[in-house]
Amino acid sequence: MKKILLTNDDGYHAKGIKALEQALEEMAEIYVVAPKHEKSACSQCITITAPLRAEKIKGKEGRHYRIDDGTPSDCVYLAINELFKHVCFDLVISGINLGSNMGEDTIYSGTVAGAIEGTIQGVPSIAISQILSNKNKNTPLSFDLAQKIIQDLVQNIFKNGYPLKGRKLLNVNVPNCSLQEYKGERITPKGYRLYKKEVHKRTDPKNESYFWLGLHPLEWQKRENEDRLSDFDAIASNHASITPLNLDLTSYDDLKSLESWHEGMLK
């Protein structure tokens, strides 16, 4: 039977990872290693200056752990190299995240980092995120669509193989709409996320200042010389976005011009 490792950055008790396990439990043998507490926007952080404690969850056949103060990268690293080192995983899936991970947000994302760590460890990996919307904030969030999308993706991977070669992963974002409103998947590049420069300053009861970061509206624009719809555009039209991500961050288009620039510096 196929074996899938699940993680997330919302924490072991988050609704998203429970929905993910529920969606896949009849398709594969499921293992879960997730942070004990929320670790959103922790990026690829891995713990090397403090010990990690792994708590085995009772009643889960020894396949569930939560990592005290661990990050998603910690969880995947520890799962593959120690907790389940005799298990050959077919997939690592990180999610279902509460909120989008599109454009440059993928660099900050703990959810995407969990899938990146799986890729680094040599396992085909997927990050999946559920878009939240202010207009639906008074409606209970449903993972029905995200569950269907991940089921279809995993089924296709098990049947036809993982679609990417090398150190690459799939990043999936699911629109906040019903199954009836859903228009299908789009293969997209990352969009260009627009960030504000605001910092929200507050004062506590002791009259000391504290700050909130990251409270930015979801705004974007097209990248230069890119005609294809981005992940943002797909979501805006009730499509899911599926974006291939590469761990190699080298800007190959700039290597020659950088060499020329450097030669000029040496003269």
Swiss-Prot record:
InterPro entries: SurE (IPR030048), SurE-like_Pase/nucleotidase (IPR002828), SurE-like_sf (IPR036523). It is found in: Cytoplasm. The keyword Ligase does not apply. Its cofactor is a divalent metal cation. Its EC number is 3.1.3.5. SUPFAM superfamilies: SurE-like. It is an enzyme of class 3 (hydrolase). NCBIfam families: PRK00346.1-4 (NF001490), PRK00346.2-4 (NF001494), surE (TIGR00087). Belongs to the SurE nucleotidase family. Nucleotidase that shows phosphatase activity on nucleoside 5'-monophosphates. This is 5'-nucleotidase SurE. The gene is surE.
